[in-house]
Design a protein with these regions (language model features):
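Bacterial N-terminal signal peptides that target proteins for export
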Residues: 2-16
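Sec/Tat-exported extracytoplasmic proteins
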Residues: 64, 90, 95-98, 105-108, ...
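Bacterial N-terminal signal peptides
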Residues: 13-26
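Sec/Tat signal peptide C-region and signal peptidase I cleavage site
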Residues: 26-32
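Short, glycine-/small- and polar/acidic-enriched structural segments
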Residues: 33-173, 178, 189-195, 218
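Conserved C-terminal helix/tail region of periplasmic/extracytoplasmic solute-binding proteins
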Residues: 309-362
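Pocket-lining segment of extracytoplasmic ligand-binding domains
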Residues: 178-274
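Secondary-structure end/capping motifs
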Residues: 232-322
Length: 362
């Protein structure tokens, strides 16, 4: 079965990614121009399966045709590789989390725009221990997780809640493919992982779910991120993507046969079935309506979250090569608020195109 939440792997090819980031700086001027053909990438995850449906059902083509452009939709099974390719100029947009948007394209110098805020994890990620105990009891223990992933971030937030630091325990880097088997061994005491692995581990006898992404709602965000220069030179590209997305949201969220068929398609395409996909939707806060995503984008909470995220990335040395402080990368928000060095603004949270969708102006 395919990994349902492959979005979270931070692969060992990070050095290659850093090279591509440096290369991107030379590619962008050539990219930024009026054009008629675009490419976007997506990878398997509950909140990104709508792109597969929108492509297969001709919804993306319908909206691209409306604006006289072409949009190619490409599935990339290696999530981090899809971001590396986006950063290097192979794609005009791709799906990614807020954390990865800041650390990879933005941290590497590519001016990027979060065009669509699709959802946030609301229980899809969790910390499980064997037996009784609380977060404070993790002190001195090993915790298995995919290092430098959102699982690592979730652990940091869990430790914050108990006034602990990573220095007081040991992080054991473990691949997602090995996580369930590792948990079943006698020497593994705690793991942090994501669904469907999380559900499988939490169902083991004696397993206790201590902390989940539902405890930090709105912090692990899933988005469609596009090249800012390409978007500025080709606003119809943004309009077509947003139009296709919210048409798909309307279909999949409906409590009718068409909605059920859409969710079934998305489940099967991601390697599960309707029940499995809907179980994952239950722990995902989807923004089916553009107004919901806009309110989230304009809230103070988003800026506060990104402040926490940038400090986590800086502390772990992945905010950008040679970043001197958490302020290294500048960010802008729809509220008008900013974070970081505005002379180096590389991540922009945008609500204008979602606003057009909300107003029926696409």
């Amino acid at each position: 079965m395919l990994r349902i939440l492959s979005r979270k792997l931070l692969s060992s090819r990070l050095l290659l990614g850093l090279f591509l980031l440096a290369l991107a700086a030379t590619l962008q001027p050539a990219q930024a121009a009026k054009k008629e053909s675009f490419r976007i990438a997506w990878s398997i995850y509950v909140g990104w399966m709508p792109w597969a449906y929108a492509d297969e059902m001709g919804i993306v083509k319908k909206w691209a045709d409306k604006y006289g452009i072409e949009i190619e939709v490409v599935q990339i099974n290696d999530y981090i590789e899809s971001i590396n390719q986006f950063t290097a100029g192979a794609f005009d947009g791709t799906v990614m989390t807020n954390m990865d948007a800041l650390s990879i394209p933005a941290g590497g110098g590519l001016d990027s725009t979060a065009l669509i805020i699709g959802d946030f994890s609301n229980g899809n990620d969790g910390l499980v221990v064997k037996g009784e105990g609380d977060i404070a009891a993790l002190k001195g223990k090993n915790v298995n997780l995919v290092e430098l992933s959102v699982s690592h971030y979730l652990l940091a937030r869990a430790l914050d809640s108990a006034k602990l630091t990573e220095r007081e325990l040991t992080v054991v880097n473990t691949s997602d493919a090995d996580m369930v088997a590792a948990y079943k061994t006698a020497d593994v005491e705690a793991v942090v992982t994501w669904n469907p692995l999380l559900s499988e581990i939490a169902a083991e006898p004696g397993a206790k779910l201590l902390y989940t992404s539902a405890d930090i709602p709105g912090e692990i965000i899933d988005m469609m991120v596009v090249n800012t220069e390409v978007l500025n030179d080709n606003p119809d590209f943004g309009k077509a993507l947003v139009g296709a997305w919210y048409e798909t949201m309307a279909v999949m969220s409906a409590d009718d046969e068409a909605g059920k068929a859409a969710r079934t398609f998305m489940g099967e395409k991601s390697g599960t079935d309707l029940a499995g996909y809907e179980a994952q939707l239950a722990t995902t806060r989807m923004f089916y309506e553009p107004a919901e995503a806009i309110a989230f984008a304009k809230s103070e909470d988003l800026m506060k979250t990104m402040d926490v995220v940038r400090r986590f990335l800086f502390d772990h040395g992945i905010l950008g090569e040679g970043a001197p402080s958490p302020d290294y990368v500048g960010m802008t928000f729809p509220s008008g608020a900013t974070l970081g060095d505005q002379a180096n603004t590389k991540l922009r949270f945008d609500a204008d195109f979602m606003g057009m969708a909300a107003e029926g102006a696409l």
